[in-house]
Structures are given as structure tokens and as C-alpha cells.
Amino acid sequence: MNNMNKVIIIGGGLAGSEAAWQAANRGCQVELVDMKPEKYSPAHSSPLLGELVCSNSLRSNDPTSAVGLMKREMRFFNSLIMDVADSTAVPAGKALAVDRDKFAEAITARLESHPNISISHREVTAVPEPADHPTIIATGPLTAEDFAESLAELTGRDRLAFYDAIAPILDSESLNMDIVYCKSRYDDGPGDYLNCPMNREEYERFISELASADYMPLKDFEDAKYFEGCLPVEVICSRGVDTLRFGPMKPVGLPDPRTGQDPYAVVQLRMENAEGSTYNMVGFQTKMTYPEQKRIFRMIPGMENVEFVRLGSIHRNTFICAPELLADTLQIKKRPDLLLAGQLSGVEGYIESAAMGLLAGINAARRAMGEELVSPPAEMALGAMVGHLTKSAAKNFQPSNVNFGLFPAWEKKVPKRFRGEKRAEASALALEVWNEKWQISEQV
């Protein structure tokens, strides 16, 4: 393969497969490198490309949901993943689920038969040296140790994580502001935190439920070695009834305006976006099952009817600190010949990983062809996801799936029942204008 219009992609999961398809369809000569079957991660067992490791569900197909919007945008750009998913779908109500074996078989067959794609099965142990052609890194959440070590040398060790620790994010409009109050500890700051106060009885009942909750079991390839600075709330709880009250739920310096006194305990909520439409629960990363999170966290005063934008989780996941390292084109800022895609870039979920592969493939092709690289508008699901990667606060960055909390705030209040529809309309318009300007969907 000569360097003319050459693109190399490392990793044959959903992101790498989609990236290869997009770049090849734009006339690039693509080398897709995957270490299977020479070497397998602890979670993989099939030699096929596009292997689904956990669930076979690709979530909602509803075009007024955030992930449904992302799927619609991907289909517009002739997504391999979406096309194969649609053709291998199994009955799943309003969700899109696939026959995982047929899904991986079809992806592999489509890529192997593409005239512009060559596939190599070998392990890449180091980040490639700077080159004239673009390289997409899509090695996934279980990136092999040697490659992760090399990537850490490039990014800085403090900018590469090996576990994500995600606390729930909630819709601020669903909070009971008759109970919840704004205040920074000891008034040290402008009062950016929201506080949910508890008396002793409420706290002890909450702790009791937390201690007996149902939890997601660890996968075979995960272990329970957590960082002390980012412990699951249930692990802290197991160390004693008052441990949380002297940790994330410390009430000192946060007097309740209704009483003028410090509460017995407090749950703090930190603003997740500049508009204040979503907040995260400070220190509440958890492995509780989703139903248990909803049940137990709605016991918190002021959160009785709370609506969650994202629920908490903790699992093995290699990912970079995207806000410090990535441009909105998915290029590594200090190495513009390198693009990142998939969960390694800081997204969560099959569709989100494939979507970042789609964008990386488009931009790698544009770079190889000498064209200007593009970034989707924030009104699109693709753009909202890129915004999370590049505009979040670096200090607290954690992976996320696509959700409406990542989209721009409404200029005027929109009734809740119409929000999905309005997001879909705005996304469709933004997509049309963006594509018309840059001619992104043009295929060779």
C-alpha cells in the first residue's frame, strides 16, 4: 500500500470497523489492523470483527431519543454498523437488538470484500511514529497492556485511566427546590453546589437500604481494586454507618436555610453543564443495579421524583482525558496525524463508539485527501457527543453515553413531552446544513 490516500486503523471493534468503512468509501486505501486471533483481550473470544462482548442490544430505535437521533445521523452517512444491525435485528420491542454472531459475521464479510480495505491480524504494541498518513486508534476499553503503556507515554500517565467511575446524572428540573438549596461549603464560592439535607432518621434509613442493595456482579476480567479517591459509594458504606457522613455526605459548613443548622448529612449535586440543566451526584459512583439506584436515590430528600439522565457504573475501561487531549475533529492535539475513536476516546456504549468511529473515518479520509477536517454542530447527537469529549471539565471527566443533557440548552422553555421531537427537528436541520456546507456524505 502506498502513502497516497492511505489510512491505518488499529482495532477492529465497532469503532474501527465503522472508521474503515467510512474512509474506504471515500476512496482511501485502508489497512485495518486487529490483534485477533493472534491475541485476545480477556473479554473477547471470536476472531470476527465487530464482536459484541456484553449485551446484544443497541438500545432505543425511537428517533426522538438521544441514541435514536445518533442512529438516524449515522444512517444518513451510510453507516456500516447501522446497516448490518438493521439486517441482523432480532425482536426487541422498541429497541434495536441483533443476533450477535450474524452481526459480527456480516461486518467481517463486508469489510473483507471491500476493494479499498486490507485486513491484518497482528498485535500493535506501540503508538506509531509520526507519519504523512493518518492513523486511527480504536483499541477499545480493554486496550492491550503494551499499547496502553505506549499511549500513556504519549498522553501522560495522569491522562489515561483504566477504570471509569460514573456517578448518576440527573435532570435539575425534577428536583424539589423547596428542600434542595444552593450553597458552597463555608460559603467558599458562589454556591454552585445543590445540597439535599438529611436528618439522622433519613440518613440511617438510607444507609440501611444502601447496605442491602442489589449490585451488578463483576465481569471475569474485572477485579475489585478501586482507587481510594474514587471508591464506590457502597464500598464506603461498608466501612461503617458513619463513614459516608464523614466523606462524600459530610454536612459541615452547609447549613440548611430552613433551620439555620448543619444537617445530619447532605448529598451534594455538582453542575454537569454550563446551563445547569443537569447535575451529578458528588461521590456517588456505584455498581448498584439500575432499578436499585432509582429506588434508593429517590429516598434522598428533594430527589423523591428525580429523573436520571444517566445512572452510575464502575467497570474496566481504558480511556483518555479527552478534554485535554482531543480536538473536536477527534485528532490528538499534539499529534494531528493520530485520531481516536470508540470507548478509548471517552464515550460509553456501542452506538457512541461506532459513531465516533464514523466521524474519525470521515476526518481521516479528509486529511488523507488534503481536505479540511470537520466537527459536527452541537445540535446533532454526534456534535453533542464530541462536545462532551472536548468541552467537559478535565478534572472530573468521565465517559458518557449520548443523552439530551449533552445538547445545547433551550433558548425558550419547551414542555417535556415535546422535547424529543424538538431535538429531532433541530438535529435534522443542523445535519442538512452541515452536510451541504462540507459535502460530507459524498461517496466515491
From Swiss-Prot:
**Which residues participate in FAD binding?**
11-16
Q: What is the uppermost EC class here?
A: transferase
This entry's Enzyme Commission designation comes to 2.1.1.74
Q: Which reaction does it catalyse?
A: uridine(54) in tRNA + (6R)-5,10-methylene-5,6,7,8-tetrahydrofolate + NADH + H(+) = 5-methyluridine(54) in tRNA + (6S)-5,6,7,8-tetrahydrofolate + NAD(+); uridine(54) in tRNA + (6R)-5,10-methylene-5,6,7,8-tetrahydrofolate + NADPH + H(+) = 5-methyluridine(54) in tRNA + (6S)-5,6,7,8-tetrahydrofolate + NADP(+)
Q: Which InterPro entries match?
A: FAD/NAD-bd_sf (IPR036188), MnmG-rel (IPR002218), MnmG_N (IPR040131), TrmFO (IPR004417)
Q: Name one GO cellular component term.
A: cytosol
* Listed GO MF terms: flavin adenine dinucleotide binding; tRNA (uracil(54)-C5)-methyltransferase activity, 5,10-methylenetetrahydrofolate-dependent
Predominantly, its location class is cytoplasm
Q: Which cofactor does it need?
A: FAD
Q: Alphabetically list the UniProt keywords.
A: Cytoplasm, FAD, Flavoprotein, Methyltransferase, NAD, NADP, Transferase, tRNA processing
List where this protein forms a coiled coil. none
What are the subcellular locations of this protein? Cytoplasm
Could you tell me what this protein does?
Catalyzes the folate-dependent formation of 5-methyl-uridine at position 54 (M-5-U54) in all tRNAs.
Protein's name in the database: Methylenetetrahydrofolate--tRNA-(uracil-5-)-methyltransferase TrmFO
Q: Which organism is it from?
A: Desulfotalea psychrophila (strain LSv54 / DSM 12343)
Instruction: Give the gene symbol.
Output: trmFO
